[in-house]
UniProtKB/Swiss-Prot annotation:
Protein name (Swiss-Prot/TrEMBL): Xyloglucan-specific endo-beta-1,4-glucanase A
Temperature dependence: Optimum temperature is 47 degrees Celsius.
Noted pH dependence of activity: Optimum pH is 6.5.
Catalyzed reaction equations: xyloglucan + H2O = xyloglucan oligosaccharides
GO cellular component: extracellular region
Biological process, per Gene Ontology: cell wall organization; polysaccharide catabolic process; xyloglucan metabolic process
InterPro entries named in the record: ConA-like_dom_sf, GH11/12, GH12
Source species taxonomy: Eukaryota, Fungi, Dikarya, Ascomycota, Pezizomycotina
Highest taxon of source: Eukaryota
Amino acid sequence: MKLLALSLASLASAATITRRADFCGQWDTATAGNFIVYNNLWGQDNADSGSQCTGVDSANGNSVSWHTTWSWSGGSSSVKSYANAAYQFTATQLSSLSSIPSTWEWQYSTTDVVANVAYDLFTSSSIGGDSEYEIMIWLAALGGAGPISSTGSSIATVTLGGVTWNLYSGPNGSMQVYSFVASSTTESFSADLMDFINYLVENQGLSNSQYLTHVQAGTEPFTGSDATLTVSSYSVSVS
């Protein structure tokens, strides 16, 4: 759906990067520290009208600050984009991972939108293979935005990283999606994302032989106007 092929051939320099011009093309990107920041308007054809631009404010190694501004109307049940910061790392088997520490500080300019703010992780049974599992961690479900779900109801409630989450499950094409949705909007977040993976391994049958292939963080808008997500600080690492 929103997964983009990420080149791991060369990691970005850890040199500090300062603010640059916004980019507005459907598939425009910017390399920023150890991230690729995507505009990623993958669902724009579902809108009657709209546009979106994304920009990098600063970056240094495993930390990045960025923003995205959008207006979308029509297609109220469809996601229009997933502007995100995608961390660049070598795909690693879950059983070999020990920690994925992350912090995220963000703010939306308005709450009069239908959108989420969410991590998006993908796993595959082989390096370079098709994604089989999608793990979303929703820090916000604004304006009634909801996750993929087979039943429309959560399958569990769990507290991880000091936040209570409702867990949903359902298919996205050939992938199985697990979505942890925060019980209340969380604009300041600090946790080890490995805790979410371990929960799924221990309680939902996710195999630890899967490879973690992508770690992304961004926003999925459905509808709204003149909305800006500002990520004042975001960091993540995989080890």
